[in-house]
Amino acid sequence: MRSGFFSILTLAALLCATSGARAESGFWIDVPYVAQQKDGCGAAVVSMVMQYWQRQQGHAASASAEPETIFRALYSRSAHGIYSSAMERYLQQNGFRTLAFSGQWQDFARELQKGRPLIVALKPDSSSSLHYAVVAGVDPDRQLVLLNDPARRKLLKEGRAEFERDWKATHNWTLLAVPQPPAQAH
């Protein structure tokens, strides 16, 4: 009986360790890709993160994780998109803990190795509006970040210098969202 328990623990540890894939010199996790509609990058990234966690928990994507549902609930005409505070609130209302912070390059490897994708805000040039993407991978040796960019494609490779320039324009805004632990019975 005791050896069966340790076998289960060993199997669980292996499964946790393989939630991401090791690239040649980097690390990435398989976050579902959602393409955006016009002004819908915020809805698309929230959808990607929600679908990722629902899949990790063995659930099908819920209606609340559909990008159209998110877009209708959160779109602001004045912003021509979705405010970051609205994304946080939506995630919290749908069972997630959120933490918005000014990120650093090393945060990516640490969180991705824990199986946690990150949402980032980017500003590609001084005249453009904000754009949201999901950091799904990082390759520190080649100085690359792998983005699920809802306007472009899944696992878009971007050089660190270009990425950090666009990210710095948003004060390195980063959002971590993880599922709330199930309520414990007393």
Model features per residue range: what roles?
Residues 1-4:
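Positively charged n-region of N-terminal signal peptides that target proteins for export
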Residues 6-7, 28:
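Compositionally biased, low-structure terminal segments
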Residues 7-17:
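Bacterial N-terminal signal peptides
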Residues 23-32, 64-185:
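Conserved active-site-adjacent core of cysteine acyl-enzyme catalytic domains
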Residues 29-59:
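N-terminal targeting signals for Sec/Tat export/insertion, comprising classic cleavable signal peptides
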